[in-house]
Amino acid sequence: MSFHAVARKQPHRGWGILESGGVALVVIVVITVVLGGLYMLWNRKNIALESANVQSIITSTQGLLKGRNGYNYTSGTVMTGLLIQVGGAPKNMMTKGNVTAGTATLWNTWGGQVIVAPVIANGFNHGFSVSYPKVPQDACIAITTRLSAGGSISGISINSTAFSDGNVTVENAGAVCVKDTGRSGINTLTFTVNG
């Protein structure tokens, strides 16, 4: 009788804790990268959208609100309400209040109330300004430099710093656009148009 040594098979024990932890770590990294990319795209969309909104407000104001004596309105509240009433506000912007009465207000993506107001120069209301509050720092830099390159804006103010020629470089904007507090932007942009 002979004895044969039979190799004993080790039972399959499945995944170990180390393998499970490694897979979980890879999944977390992938989710983080995807969410970060989505946040960047969302932010860029807001910047492009609000740049277009400012341009649309300027064009609509020039075409719909300029009268024989320029922009002869008593206040920015009245002028903004009338712009909304005549259909000159971008449709993607939020309005609050009574649109048909001309008392509605206009709000940007970041929750700031946008005001279109007459600007008096040499005793005449031949210009107007568009005030954009609560703008985040990155959007402040991008929007001001983008609209500065367009050439239709006579002056740009970032917070309390005025660029009376309407020319704002990335370096200029980067120096005066203030960082956000938490997740809220605190920059106020004012675009002035003569004519």
Language model: regions and residue ranges:
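Periplasmic/extracellular, small/polar-rich flexible segments of pilin-like filament-forming proteins
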Residues: 67-195
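Generic detector of isolated residues embedded in canonical secondary-structure elements
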Residues: 37, 56, 139-142
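Membrane-proximal N-terminal amphipathic helix
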Residues: 32, 39-78, 82
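N-terminal single-pass transmembrane signal-anchor helix
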Residues: 1-46, 50
